[in-house]
Each structure stands twice: as structure tokens, then as C-alpha cells.
């Protein structure tokens, strides 16, 4: 449908990222959106009519009257005609297109308030499955199978630029930028409009192998990708500049793509979101959660906390596995060594190995204690635990006072503090067990990390930032 519309210079608005795996009936049943939802709405806004088979085998045809050719909630009252036909009344028409033969068994009109299809600040109201008795739409297939639909097509304005906004500050502070940008472009300055706006969080950026456009040399905490369209290039350019200025106010940097090729490159990362499953080499559980845009920051912040808790717990699981590995290595003794030093007796080698294992055990013990302390006191200010952390090898006493009054959670979120296997354990193990002689020891310890890491749970978010629909994904 999207390709046929494009060939005629038109746009099919309900074009989700999962288009390759989607069908038209599914789009209606889910009230699907996509990146163009911010401009033209979801399926319900773009449907003229649809046909479906109910559980009794009867045909239903739902036809919207007096369509406003815009978003449904902008119309005070919305009317639908609902016609019921028998199972055998749908026949092949003269043009080969199915059509109904004879009068419907039953017809009725359904009149609904346009506002009931939306909740304030939301793209759709998923709590209202009944929708006043309107069949098919947003029912997820529960009241029948949708077989066909007639859609409104749109004309895309001729001028378009894609903006990519990278945010490096706290995620909760960055997310309100979505509201800023949408509020600005909802005014249609000089006719410029937002034709698509999508969000990727840090977990997704890692999964898709995102190449940061900024020169900062760090992965952003959040990326927004949006299309700005309009009738004149000048209006679109000015709107893009203002959007970047709004991003700058929230620790963001902006980049603009003008040519079709560069715009496609900007959107390529968004299209690869299924790569999140790479983290576990498996599949992902998807949950769509609809959040009011003005509360998206709270949701993002809470998800970040879950990820930090899960990450630390996974590393504590790792310390237990490493302790067992060190015990196993001690039991094996010099037999684990790859080769012996000439002139060094087996007794001397055993003593050297025991000393190294003892030091490794002490490092592991202190690291585990540090991580456990942080996990148990995320909401406490740094200053409360700085003395104990210093005893465990993490000296925060010299931090500026304004840093020490922050919560441990805040410092972990912005990476002022890190819980790092590589820096705190792996590098220390490599120092203690250097060279070819100890390569089997290092291999054993690093294999522990790989095994335990695969059991880590984390949550990744990407959002249709224009309609509040947050895809919350847990790779399994």
C-alpha cells in the first residue's frame, strides 16, 4: 500500500517500522501508528471504511461518515455506519473486487465524541478497548478478523529535512525536549510541520551499533530523529534550526540531513531496532506502553534505575562465580599453568600462584563489597558512604561537595561513578596473571564473565515520540 501510494506521489500514513511483518488487518486491529503518526495520526484517523468477519461468520462493514480528513479528535462528533451481511453475501464484483450482494441484514449508526479516541497528552487511549461499540479498531482481533480497509492518503509537502538530535545529559532532563519540539512545530511556523519523530534510548543505540555524530567521543543517552516538512525550503530550514536550538538547551546537539541519501542514513539506525536481541543472541519481549508525553521523563528515569539495579545484581552474581573459579584454580594448582619458568621449582611456582590467587581474592572481596554497598544504598547521598567506599578502594573523599551531596544513583546514571568488570576486575586479574604462563587462568576467569553476562536482564526503550507509544523491550 505504501509503495503504491508513493508511486502516485501520495503517502500512506499508517506505515509502522514493522511494515515488512505487518498486514492491513493488523494495522486496524492494533490502531497502528508509525513515525508519521505525529502528523497524520494512527489508523483510526485515516480509515474511511473496513470489512471484517465476526465470530458468527457474518460480515461487518464499517463506514465513517463526514470524514474530516484529519485527526479524529479534532472533530466534535464522529459518525460510523455499521452494516451486517450474511456469510455468502460477499461476492466477486464486475472488476474482480469483492462487493456485497443484496441489502444488509442489519444497519445502524454509531455517533461518538471525537475526543473519546484520545486521552489528554496521549496518542491513543489503550484503556478504552470498547470505543463505544465500534467494531474491529483497537480490539487486537478479539471481535473478528479484519479483511480489508479503505484508507485516506496524503500529500507530503515538497520540502523535507531530517534532524538527528543527540543528548548527552541526564535522560530525565533530555526527554522533555520531545514536548518542546512538538509544541513548537504544532504551531506550524511558516507552514513547517513535524512529519515524524522517533526516540532511541542508550540501550538501543548500543544494540544497533550507533555511530555518534557529535565530536564528544561518547555514546548519547538519547537520540531523537525527526522529519520536518513544509512548502518552502526556507521555512523548513528555519524550523530545523529552531529545533536544534531547543535541543541545545537540554544538553543536546543537532545535525541536519537535506539530501535523500543522507536522510535515509539518519533513519537507518531506527530501522535496525530489532538488533536489540543481539545482546543475548535470542529474542525480545515487546510491551507497548502509552505514556503522557509530559511524564515520559519519569518513565525513562525509572527504566534507567531498573537497568542499573539489574546490571549491579548481574555483576554481584559474577563475583560469586569468580570466587568459585579462583577456588577451582587453587585446587588444580600448578597443573593449570601453561608452561613453567626454567630454573623455578614446582614448589616456588605453587607459592607464586597461591600469592597471586590470594591477592586476586582480596581484590574480588573488596570489589564485591563496593558493588553490594552501592546496590543497597542507591538513594543515599555519596557523602554518607564515602568513608566506607574509601576503605574498599574507591576514594570519593576528594570529590567536590556538590558532587558528594548527589545520590549514588544519580552518579551511576551520568557515569560519574561506574561499576565496571573491565576496570575493577579484569584489568587487575591480567596484572596479577600476566603472560603465557597464566593464560589458562585468565581464560577461565574471563569465561565466567561471558557466561554470567548472558543472564543479565535489561530493558530498552524506543518511542514513537509524537504519540507517546513507548516500545519497552526485554531481550530474553
Features from the language model and the residues they span:
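C-terminal substrate-recognition/cap domain of FAD-linked oxidoreductases
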Residues: 139, 145-476
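FAD-binding subdomain of flavoenzyme oxidoreductases
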Residues: 1-179
Amino acid at each position: 500500500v505504501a509503495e503504491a501510494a508513493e508511486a502516485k506521489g501520495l503517502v500512506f500514513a499508517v506505515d509502522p517500522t514493522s511494515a515488512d511483518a505487518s498486514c492491513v488487518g493488523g494495522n486496524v486491529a492494533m490502531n497502528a501508528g508509525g513515525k508519521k503518526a505525529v502528523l497524520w495520526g494512527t489508523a483510526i484517523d485515516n480509515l474511511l471504511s473496513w470489512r471484517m468477519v465476526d465470530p458468527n461468520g457474518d460480515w461487518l462493514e464499517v463506514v465513517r461518515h463526514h470524514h474530516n480528513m484529519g485527526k479524529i479528535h479534532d472533530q466534535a462528533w464522529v459518525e460510523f455506519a455499521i452494516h451486517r451481511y450474511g456469510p455468502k453475501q460477499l461476492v466477486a464484483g464486475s472488476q474482480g473486487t469483492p462487493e456485497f450482494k443484496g441489502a444488509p441484514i442489519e444497519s445502524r449508526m454509531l455517533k461518538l465524541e471525537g475526543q473519546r479516541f484520545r486521552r489528554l497528552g496521549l496518542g491513543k487511549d489503550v484503556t478504552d478497548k470498547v470505543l463505544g461499540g465500534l467494531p474491529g479498531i483497537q480490539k487486537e482481533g478479539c471481535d473478528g478478523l479484519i479483511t480489508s480497509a479503505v484508507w485516506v492518503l496524503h500529500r507530503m509537502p515538497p520540502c523535507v529535512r531530517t534532524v538527528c538530535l543527540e543528548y548527552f545529559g541526564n535522560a530525565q532532563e533530555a526527554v522533555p525536549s520531545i514536548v518542546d519540539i512538538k509544541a513548537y512545530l504544532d504551531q506550524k511556523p511558516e507552514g513547517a510541520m513535524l512529519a515524524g519523530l522517533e526516540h532511541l534510548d542508550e540501550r538501543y543505540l548500543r544494540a544497533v551499533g550507533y555511530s555518534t555524530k557529535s565530536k564528544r567521543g561518547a555514546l548519547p543517552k538519547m537520540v531523537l530523529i525527526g522529519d520536518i516538512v513544509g512548502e518552502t525550503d526556507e521555512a523548513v530550514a528555519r524550523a530545523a534550526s529552531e529545533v536544534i536550538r531547543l535541543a541545545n538547551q537540554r544538553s543536546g546537539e543537532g545535525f541536519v540531513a537535506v539530501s535523500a541519501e543522507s536522510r535515509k542514513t539518519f533513519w537507518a539506525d531506527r530501522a535496525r531496532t530489532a538488533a536489540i536481541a543481539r545482546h543475548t543472541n535470542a529474542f525480545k519481549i515487546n510491551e507497548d506502553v502509552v505514556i503522557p508525553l509530559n511524564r515520559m521523563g519519569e518513565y525513562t528515569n525509572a527504566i534507567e534505575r531498573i537497568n542499573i539495579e539489574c546490571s549491579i545484581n548481574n555483576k554481584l552474581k559474577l563475583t560469586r562465580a569468580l570466587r568459585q573459579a579462583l577456588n577451582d584454580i587453587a585446587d588444580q594448582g600448578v597443573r593449570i599453568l601453561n608452561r613453567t619458568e626454567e630454573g623455578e621449582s614446582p614448589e616456588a611456582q605453587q607459592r607464586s600462584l597461591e600469592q597471586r590467587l590470594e591477592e586476586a581474592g582480596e581484590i574480588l572481596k573488596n570489589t564485591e563489597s563496593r558493588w553490594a554497598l552501592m546496590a543497597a544504598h542507591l538513594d543515599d547521598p555519596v557523602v554518607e558512604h564515602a568513608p566506607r567506599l574509601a576503605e574498599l578502594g574507591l576514594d570519593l573523599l576528594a570529590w567536590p561537595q556538590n558532587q558528594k551531596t548527589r545520590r549514588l544513583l544519580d552518579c551511576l546514571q551520568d557515569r560519574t561513578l561506574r561499576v565496571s568488570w573491565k576496570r575493577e576486575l579484569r584489568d587487575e586479574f591480567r596484572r596479577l596473571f600476566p603472560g603465557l604462563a597464566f593464560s589458562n587462568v585468565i581464560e577461565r576467569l574471563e569465561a565466567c564473565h561471558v557466561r554470567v553476562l548472558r543472564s543479565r536482564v535489561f530493558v530498552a526503550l524506543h518511542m514513537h515520540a509524537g504519540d507517546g507509544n513507548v516500545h519497552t523491550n526485554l531481550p530474553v
